[in-house]
Amino acid sequence: DVVGYGGSPVECVDLLRENGIPCLKGNHDAMVAHGNQVAGRMKLMWDWTEQQLSFEQRSWLAELPMTFELPEFQAVHAMLPMPEEWGYVLTASHAAMHFAYQTNPLCFIGHTHSPAFWIEGEDREHEITSIEPVFLDRKQLINVGSVGQPRDGDGRACYVIYRLDQQDVWWRRVDYDIQAAQHAIEDACLPLAFAERLSRGK
């Protein structure tokens, strides 16, 4: 998700647009760009976010692709085969359903906000070390975690680097100014729960 959680949606959209960074559509991007019918604090956040963005910025979100594929890997925000239904890969059975439609040996996903590593044929989530080899003879599913809204108990930003020359995936955690992100949410008078969870990584 580019937007829909924090107090700096304009800056996030502009950073990606101005630098030509390829990006997939997340469920929060879709709700902001296409409208939503939810209630509660998520509606407050999404409605506020929509009001901050220009027509061009919302159009950019609306036009983001659902999937991305290169010869070396494919990527999708949620679960295959229907990413627009925003299914979560949380268990080995979820991963098995996803693998049935994964066309590349390696696929990157997000959506759960927690780093994870699934290997086809294994009945449980693969334990992550900081660097994992990529085996092109069997399918692997890699959740990249979250930069701005981690949910695995570690508040630091999480992302991965796929090193083609080494054929491995490197999970990285980096510190960022969590208080500044919290203040942006508070200054916008958005629900405090969005700010409080940043320091907990939950």
Can you describe what each PLM-predicted range is?
Residues D1, Y5, P22-N27, V76, ...:
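Active-site neighborhood of phospho(di)ester-bond hydrolases with catalytic His/Asp-centered motifs
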Residues D1-A62:
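Core catalytic region of metal-dependent phosphoesterases/phosphodiesterases
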Residues V10-E11, N36-Q37, G87, I119-E122, ...:
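Short amphipathic alpha-helical segments
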Residues Q52-I119:
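His/acidic metal-ligating clusters that form di-metal
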Residues G4-G6, H28-A33, P81-P83, F108-E120, ...:
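Active-site environment of divalent metal-dependent phosphoester hydrolases
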